[in-house]
Swiss-Prot record:
GO terms for molecular function: actin binding; metal ion binding. PROSITE patterns: HP, LIM_DOMAIN_1, LIM_DOMAIN_2. Signal peptide: none annotated. There is a cross-link at K704 (Glycyl lysine isopeptide (Lys-Gly) (interchain with G-Cter in SUMO2)). The modification Phosphoserine is found at residues 216, 411, 466, 470, 475, 479, 496, 499, 502, 582, 671, 723, 738, 760, 789. Isoform 1 is not necessary for normal axon guidance. Residues 404-413, 536-546, 724-738 have a biased composition (Low complexity). Residues 97-156, 156-216, 224-283, 283-343 form the LIM zinc-binding domain. The gene is Ablim1. This is Actin-binding LIM protein 1. The modification Phosphothreonine is found at T477. Gene3D superfamilies: Cysteine Rich Protein, Villin headpiece domain. It is found in: Cytoplasm; Cytoplasm, Cytoskeleton.
Length: 861
């Protein structure tokens, strides 16, 4: 009996219409994943052909949906009679299904995604490798990702709840929400689709919650208009800012026109971006000169960042509401200011500056009848000899200038005078100074009383009228008798003021504040027998009969021009021409001093170098005099070579001492010891004076150490000359030599930087040498202490730990007898062990950086 057709590999690809994937990039909840089931069916052979029947094969197709529970079962049927018998030529034409990932042919259960087929084990996530057949998946750039990896790499979080957003989303103001998370801030109700949302810059409000914000019916009626463009806000989002509603694109910066989406600053009802607001209305910090945003600290008319306002003393910031002192551009804490004042009181008193007296007297102007040019200007005097000696005084360290002199004939003029470094200068001297060298301290000259140099009284008017003086020319034409009378009166006046016939043609009056030597005046010699040189000019010095607020100057230079006949003394007109009979033609107004300048042939026509060059000349002159004094102490005024071996300083060199010389040694030694004791006493007094100025615990400690050392020195000096025979050649002097390298090594043990005295030769003259006697009774030739500090002779005082702590503000009270560099030394041993966990001896063995670090942690550094 013929057998039935055997179905060895009969199958059908089944699909569902629901399985259409709308998007190739993502399979969401609506997407279905198809599963293909290929079954091998075999029909048992039946010997009887009549028993052949039509059969129905049912295929189970699993339809998976992401997140929709268990897979759905779909049934599909087909008629096996339709299938062609399996013969070689039909089986070879069947297509072979290959896996898209591994490329192997698919047999059994396979998965189909769109047009691609996968083995079940090959369809996995690209990132984590998990099986995608049991859950939803996402397609990104051709890669298959699980839900967790896709959300982690490409997902968007809700701005309300912070979870990842899937499905329907709401986007507002650049932020994404779940539909249920985008709700009104006040009533917490979600916004329905198509509803209008009001954003006031901070909150999103619905229509019911935003309606009470309208303060008047007018505002309520106009609330639908944009404040920027004026048009009605219809559909879309509205922005509420500055109590107005705006389109999102109409809310712009008034200056640059940039759309404001984040923060803004309002000024006079207009919005600005931060950059433009700072450029137009910003306030800069006085410390860093940057614009201040946020909190600002105000001190007077100055503004600071809270982090920039720091105390100039302790460098700590000021807290809100804290008091401060403001001085110029520096600020202080009240406690720091008080401690500064305390330290200033402990310092040596500063020498007060000398007061600078400025006067603006009137100068007299005379015009001749021949030329309208001004001939002579009388310079001002430093004081007034006829008025009250009390003069207005201004304290200033530099120069001051006043209004310039008038050029109108007959009007009172004013010249510029200033006092710089105890020297009076006029305006031409000030003009000779470069601008970078001159410092002008402007004051109010109108507060100074102006007085003329010479106050004309009734008697002087009588003289001018008697001399025939006219108010226009001020040039008297006296007779011989009247002229002689005026001359005698002038000589008497000049003599009473301290100078007789002393013409001064220099315009530079020099008046220091202290007098060091008496004035010496020179009487000029006679030009010819019977003819005396006479000048109407007088010096600016005064006698003791006139009260003056300043002492006389130590030096005064007088320039005497040689006038012979009618020859002028310079290129200018001579103020006093002579007649052939050796008498002046027409004397000028002799009562007023007429100082004029005789130009030199050099470049500087003012005969005096500028101020900045005068200091160098004075310094060179002082150095020369110091060198003279220094070299006068050397034999033959020659300083010995420091590399040369010094000669033996004894009265008997090069021969041995005789008995007669030895007999005279005790007196000489006794006088030397007295001088040594006087020198030690003088040094001790000097040290005590310096330490009294220091007035600190460290200074008292140094003083005690020095006194103990000097007592040992005196004891050694008393027993130094036990052997009278060899004392002259081996006993060095205990005086400090000011000549290093000549007889002694010149090396001194430094006493202290606080009271070490320096002489003009540069060596220290406050220390006492430490000599140690050798076993044979001789003294060492050279002893040099290098890097050795003085021993601590006193036990440090014990203070509580709270008083020694260094806070951020510093100690409120400065403790006396405390070494600030070693605060830990003033702790009790048990307190020291409690803080540092070790003894003082163990602490000293640690390296310096370790000790400093431990002291910083304990607030003792």
């Amino acid at each position: 009996m013929p057998s039935l057709l055997g179905l060895k590999c009969l199958g059908k690809l089944c699909s569902s219409e629901i399985g259409k994937v709308p998007s190739p990039e993502r399979a969401s909840l609506r997407n279905s994943h198809r599963r293909l089931l290929i079954e091998d069916l075999s029909v048992p052979e039946t010997p009887d052909p009549a028993h052949r029947r039509r059969g129905t094969v049912i295929h189970l197709v699993y339809l998976y949906s992401a997140g929709c529970g268990p897979p759905e079962l779909r049934f599909s049927s087909y008629d096996p009679s339709v299938a062609h018998p399996q013969d070689p030529h039909h089986s070879s034409e069947k297509p072979v299904i290959h896996c898209h990932k591994c490329g192997e042919p698919c047999k059994g259960e396979v998965l189909r995604v769109q047009t691609k087929h996968f083995h079940i084990k090959c369809f996995t996530c690209k990132v984590c490798g998990c099986d995608l057949a049991q859950g939803g998946f996402f397609i990104k750039n051709g890669d298959y990702l699980c839900t967790l990896d896709y959300q982690r790499m490409y997902g968007t979080r809700c701005h309300g709840c912070g979870e990842f957003v899937e499905g329907e989303v709401v986007t507002a103001l650049g932020k994404t929400y779940h539909p249920n998370c985008f709700a009104c801030t006040i009533c917490k109700r979600p916004f329905p689709p198509g509803d209008r949302v009001t954003f006031n810059g901070r909150d999103c409000l619905c229509q019911l919650c935003a309606q009470p914000m309208s303060s008047s019916p007018k505002e309520a009626s106009c609330s639908s208009n944009c404040a920027g463009c004026g048009r009605d806000i219809k559909n879309g989002q509205a922005l509420l800012a500055l109590d107005k509603q705006w389109h999102l694109g109409c809310f712009k910066c008034k200056s640059c026109g940039k759309v404001l989406t984040g923060e803004y600053i309002s000024k006079d009802g207009s919005p600005y971006c931060e950059k433009d607001y700072q450029g137009l209305f910003g306030v800069k910090c006085e410390a860093c000169h940057q614009f201040i945003t946020g909190k600002v600290l105000e001190a007077g008319d100055k503004h600071y960042h809270p982090s920039c306002a720091r105390c100039s003393r302790c460098n700590q910031m000021f807290t809100e509401g804290e008091e401060m002192y403001l001085q110029g551009s520096t600020v202080w804490h009240p406690d720091c200011k008080q401690s500064t004042k305390t330290e200033e009181k402990l310092r040596p008193p500063n020498i007060p500056r000398s007061s600078s007296d400025f006067f603006y007297p009137k100068s007299l102007i005379r015009r001749t009848g021949r030329s309208p040019a001004l001939q002579l200007l009388s310079p001002p005097c430093l004081t007034n000899s006829n008025k009250n000696p009390r003069q207005p005084t201004r304290t200033s360290s530099e120069s001051i200038y006043s209004r310039p002199g008038s050029s109108i004939p007959g009007s009172p003029g004013h010249t510029i005078y200033a006092k710089v470094d105890n020297e009076i200068l006029d305006y031409k001297d000030l003009a000779a100074i470069p601008k970078v060298k001159a410092i002008y301290d402007i004051e109010r000259p109108d507060l100074i009383t102006y007085e003329p140099f010479y106050t004309s009284g009734y008697e002087d008017k009588q003289e001018r009228q008697s001399l025939g003086e006219s108010p226009r020319t001020l040039s008297p034409t006296p007779s011989a008798e009247g002229y002689q009378d005026v001359r005698d009166r002038m000589i008497h006046r000049s003599t009473s003021q301290g100078s007789i016939n002393s013409p001064v043609y220099s315009r530079h009056s020099y008046t220091p504040t202290t007098s060091r030597s008496p004035q010496h005046f020179h009487r000029p010699e006679l030009l010819s027998p019977g003819v005396h040189r006479w000048s109407p000019l007088r010096t600016s010095s005064f006698s003791s009969t006139h009260s003056d607020s300043r002492p006389n100057p130590p030096f005064r230079h007088h320039f005497l021009p040689h006038v012979k006949g009618n020859e002028p003394s310079s290129g200018r007109n001579s103020p006093l021409p002579y007649r052939p009979d050796s008498r002046p033609l027409t004397p000028t107004y002799a009562q007023a001093p007429k100082h004029f300048h005789v130009p030199d042939q050099g470049i500087n026509i003012y005969r005096k170098p500028p101020i900045y060059k005068q200091h160098a000349a004075l310094a060179a002159q002082s150095k020369a005099s110091e060198d003279i004094i220094k070299f006068s102490k050397f034999p033959a005024a020659q300083a010995p070579d420091p590399n040369e071996i010094p000669k033996i300083e004894t009265d008997h060199w090069p021969g041995p001492p005789s008995l007669a010389a030895v007999g005279t040694d005790p007196r000489r030694r006794s006088s030397g010891r007295e001088e040594d004791e006087e020198e030690l006493l003088r040094r001790r007094q000097l040290q005590e004076e310096q330490l009294m100025k220091l007035n600190s615990g460290l200074g008292q400690l140094i003083l005690k150490e020095e006194m103990e050392k000097e007592s040992r020195e005196r004891a050694s000096l008393a027993s130094r000359y036990d052997s009278p025979l060899h004392s002259a050649s081996h006993a060095p002097s205990s005086k400090t030599s000011s000549l290093p390298g000549y007889g002694k090594n010149g090396l001194h043990r430094p006493v202290s930087t606080d009271f070490a005295q320096y002489n003009s030769y540069g060596d220290i003259s406050g220390g006492v040498r430490d000599y140690q006697t050798l076993p044979d009774g001789h003294m060492p030739a050279v002893r040099m202490d290098r890097g050795v500090s003085m021993p601590n002779m006193l036990e440090p005082k014990i203070f509580p730990y709270e008083m020694l702590m260094v806070t951020n503000r510093g100690r409120n009270k400065i403790l006396r007898d405390v070494d600030r560099t070693r605060l830990e030394r003033h702790l009790a041993p048990e307190v020291f062990w409690e803080i540092f966990g070790m003894s003082i001896q163990e602490f000293d063995k640690l390296p310096l950086w370790r000790r400093n670090d431990m002291k910083k942690k304990a607030k003792l550094f």
